[in-house]
Amino acid sequence: MPPTESPTTAIERLLRSGDAAGALRIADELIKQSRRSFPGWLSRGCANMNLGRLVDADVDIDTALKLSPTDPQASLLRGMIDQRLGRIDNAIKHLRRVSASSAPQSIEASNALAEVLWFAHRRDELAAFVAAGGAWLRDPRAALMIARVRASHDIDGAITDLQSIAARERSPILRRVAGFEAVGLLDKTARYREAFDLSVKLHADTTPPFDLEGMLAPVRQQHAQLASASAWPAPRVEAITGLAMVVGLPRSGTTLLEQMLDAHPSISGIGEYDGVDMLANDLVSTGRWPRAASSIARDDLLAMQSRYMSGARRLTREGATISFDKTLRAWRWLPAIAAVLPGTVCFQVARDPRDSAISTFLSYFHPINDGWTASLTSLRRVLEAERSILPSMLQSVGLAHECIVYEDLVEDPTGHATRCLNRLGLAMDARVLAPEANTRAVFTLSHEQVRRPINRTSIGRWKNYEFAFDSSWDALACAHDERRVIR
């Protein structure tokens, strides 16, 4: 930090440059100097949100608003965090207030409000908000919202608009989002080759190089240990209760299962909570995981457990006794979960690998965090790695679990729901069979699908793109078919 630069100026500079971790360090120093530092808590919340630590950001912004209840920047962040945590009504309340104000943040709040209305399927409200006009419509991002509204009555026109955004805008993220929305509409109108070709171009233009080998390294270590039949160390912390977790890859039916189980009054979906990422980072940062796991201090393991559970409970609906974490990272970190969170009940979900792959390839994923989604070849390698350790790893590390094949779940939702609830010690509740009636908002790529009754339409989707799959997929597909009970 230059000598003449104030802490808040330094934080703003670091956030603009993408160094959220550096901004967090300065914010922590401000709070260390005074627990009543509004700039410290506000900056900490912004940095944590940028780092994906939404529970920490949630606490930070709550604290900031207690210190300055009417601050527009804090209200903006409050609304954005609430959206990602599924608190839609609260998000809309905060964002509408800032959007309607004369504060400099009104443009950002208007774009965020439009995004909330879109994901919450409040399409009439979104159309009215766009029709009302305002300065925010001159922001480049507003073109995306206008195209989304147009898609409700003119799909071909919306495709043209979205493709234009993807081709001309300077922001790579905006190009990517608009482009993949165009892909979705092309797929919806059976223009499959166009959808595939546009996806190839978008991935090539907006996905930086990705370290696939680094991502798969811990999976290979686990596979080697499974092959050697070596036992994993017994947990050195007490088992927790009231936690269930998805184990699986994106686009495998995980959101459907979450919405089904969340409809049970005793279960609360907590979305893709970042707790497993933080737990894994904490373990790796000891320098002893996994080869010297037994030398990690028990107190450190307890602190990791407490941090995870505290965040999960904060996200859990009042009255529910079980938190359901739909993390998409757990499959790579099962030994870590068993070491820190013994007692977790896991639900492994697997879908036809070709359906999972094409659905992922045609969808927007974060280009840096999820760069492995940029080609069918890398998708196949990740699927092969996942299935090389699952479900065997769940048994090996001693985690209670159920294995669910997506196609069977769709064919027999009653039987599968009953099995899942029995594993959690709960009685069947008919509400779990109507996930489309669940009012909980979903901030995932499956937000539209789970608004419909359970159906078979996504089974065999890969056949529309059969030209993209060669014989290298045959072994994965055959192994999956052998797991199916209902055919």
Predicted regions and their residues:
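Short coil turns that delineate tetratricopeptide repeat
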Residues: 35, 69, 103-104, 137-138, ...
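Phosphate-binding active sites in nucleotide-utilizing proteins
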Residues: 236-341, 345, 349-350
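PAPS-dependent sulfotransferases, especially Golgi type II membrane carbohydrate sulfotransferases
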Residues: 127-130, 150, 156-165, 169-171, ...
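Residue-level detector of the short coil/turn that links helix A to helix B
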Residues: 18, 52, 86, 121, ...
